[in-house]
Swiss-Prot record:
NCBIfam families referenced in this protein's UniProt entry, alphabetically: PRK11572.1
Pfam families: CutC
GO cellular component: cytoplasm
Name of the protein: PF03932 family protein CutC
Family: Belongs to the CutC family.
GO molecular function, one term: copper ion binding
Main location: cytoplasm
Subunit structure: Homodimer.
Entry keyword set: Cytoplasm
HAMAP family assigned to the protein according to its UniProt record, in alphabetical order: CutC
Subcellular location: Cytoplasm
Length: 248
């Protein structure tokens, strides 16, 4: 049966995902940045309360995946922290300036991760040559690759995803970006074994007093009284679709 991973941005969201049938959680901070390394407090809280596998993302900032020496040092420290806390896996990725996998740095990450399952995230979708990159990741011992098939969403990239899945000895290929209940059957029918979804919704803040003339964001037009949360009903719906597909 296909595995359902839900992207979560808080302990509460991780619990919601677990309660509604998620098989695994990718734990992040900063949804508007596409996911950054969670704080130590969030990591510890989730480790204590969530019982399904949780893989934290290790990404020090938004933007591209070519990092300074200081940023890479922080990545290694975060990898060691996640390992010490007892998480079963993590999610990360580093590229060179030419769009290829930074093999020396990824080798250091793999050594620091030790027995943890390492997912190479959507840095893969920004690489210059996906098949060469897949060979590199196979050589590194990466467990899985999260990809949209180098398109803006995974449904558009499904043909490339299937090409990657067919690649001999490849890591697990997990489809992600725009995967939701209404298009999930396309991935299941194609034989995708792992899918990644935010199953998210924007929820109004409980704040009653609101200073509308002031923003804490660099985007002056951002609505800071909305919070991104996991929609438990959406997770349950996707899990039900997977189970019914398996029963066919």
């Amino acid at each position: 049966m296909a595995l359902l991973e839900i992207c979560c941005y808080s302990m509460e969201c991780a619990l919601t995902a677990q309660q509604n049938g998620a098989d695994r959680v990718e734990l992040c901070a900063a949804p508007k940045e596409g996911g950054l390394t969670p704080s130590l407090g969030v990591l510890k809280s989730v480790r204590q309360r969530v019982t399904i596998p949780v893989h934290p993302i290790i990404r020090p900032r938004g933007g591209d995946f070519c990092y300074s020496d200081g940023e890479f040092a922080a990545i290694l420290e975060d990898v060691r922290t996640v390992r010490e806390l007892g998480f079963p896996g993590l999610v990360t990725g580093v590229l060179e300036v030419d769009g290829n996998v930074d093999m020396p740095r990824m080798e250091k990450i793999m050594a620091a991760a030790g027995p943890l399952a390492v997912t190479f995230h959507r840095a893969f979708d920004m690489c210059a040559n996906p098949l060469n990159t897949l060979n590199n990741l196979t050589e590194l011992g990466i467990t899985r690759v999260l990809t949209s098939g180098q398109k803006s969403d995974a449904l558009q990239g499904l043909s490339k995803i299937m090409e990657l899945i067919a690649h001999r000895d490849a890591p697990i290929i997990m489809a992600g970006a725009g995967v939701r209940a209404e298009n999930l059957h396309h991935f299941l029918d194609a034989g995708v074994l792992e899918v990644h979804s935010s199953a998210g919704a924007w929820q109004a803040s409980p704040m009653r007093y609101r200073n509308q003339g002031l923003s804490m964001s660099s985007d002056a037009h951002a609505d800071e009284y909305l919070r991104y949360v996991v929609d438990g009903a959406a997770v349950a719906e996707m899990k039900g679709i997977i189970e019914r597909h398996q029963a066919k």
